[in-house]
């Protein structure tokens, strides 16, 4: 999936795909764990598979970015690295990005969805040029242990099963009322809506 769109707030979530975001105008905040990373035009962010992340827009004006979402089979030889490692600092600043990378990202945007082999080849170029600029650490070192991240991780690990809010709260060691408030305040939807969205997103990315 490759789209250029107006940047917006996106709640904490994770998926088993690589996500690359390139700011094309204005600014964007990329949240990973409890850290919020500021991005400006030309900066490129990398979110490896199964890393919880979110986006915030704090800058007035026109804020746009290109988002590339690549399933594991399209990242070929980089897939093994991305399963166990993640960037310590997930942003490559614009001054460190070769012009070729922007050209290739634009080429991916213009590639027909049916031309998966072409898009995959372009993606290999982006990764070959950029992965070496990221300091990779064990994935377990990237993230957070707070309740928001425990919640996202729990849903991601268990959404294929049948379970209730009460069962989830018990497993996380909190009351169901605390968990219910978390869904409404942080995710702006109830438990069932969030769980159904996770199942739908999985079906769409298969």
Indicate where each model-derived feature is located.
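N-terminal positioning helix adjacent to the helix-turn-helix/winged-helix DNA-binding module
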Residues: 97, 143-151, 187, 196-199
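Cytosolic nucleotide-utilizing catalytic cores of signal-transduction proteins
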Residues: 114-119, 141-146, 160
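Basic/polar phosphate-binding segments, predominantly the helix-turn-helix DNA-binding elements
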Residues: 134, 162-198
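Short alpha-helical segment immediately N-terminal to, or the first helix within
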Residues: 154-158, 193, 205-206
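Short, intrinsically disordered, charge-balanced linker/junction segments flanking boundaries
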Residues: 67-70, 109-112, 196, 200-206
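Amphipathic alpha-helical segments enriched in hydrophobic/aromatic residues interleaved with Lys/Arg
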Residues: 79-137, 153
């Amino acid at each position: 999936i490759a789209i250029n769109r107006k940047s917006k707030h996106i709640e904490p979530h994770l998926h088993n795909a690589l996500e690359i975001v390139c700011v094309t105008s204005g600014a964007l905040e990329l949240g990973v764990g409890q850290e919020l990373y500021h991005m400006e035009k030309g900066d490129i962010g990398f979110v490896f598979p199964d890393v919880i992340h979110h986006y915030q827009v704090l800058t007035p004006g026109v804020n746009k970015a290109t988002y590339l979402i690549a399933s594991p089979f399209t990242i070929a030889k980089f897939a093994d690295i991305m399963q166990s490692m993640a960037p310590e600092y997930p942003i490559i600043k614009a001054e460190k990005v070769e012009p070729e990378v922007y050209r290739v990202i634009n080429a991916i945007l213009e590639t027909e969805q049916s031309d998966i082999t072409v898009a995959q080849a372009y993606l290999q170029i982006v990764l070959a040029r950029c992965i070496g600029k990221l300091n990779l650490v064990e994935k377990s070192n990237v993230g957070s242990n707070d309740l928001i991240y425990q919640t996202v991780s729990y849903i991601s690990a268990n959404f294929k099963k049948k379970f209730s809010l009460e069962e989830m709260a018990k497993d996380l060691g909190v009351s169901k009322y605390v968990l219910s408030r978390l869904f409404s305040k942080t995710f702006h939807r109830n438990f069932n809506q969030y769980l159904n969205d996770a199942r739908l997103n999985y079906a769409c990315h298969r």
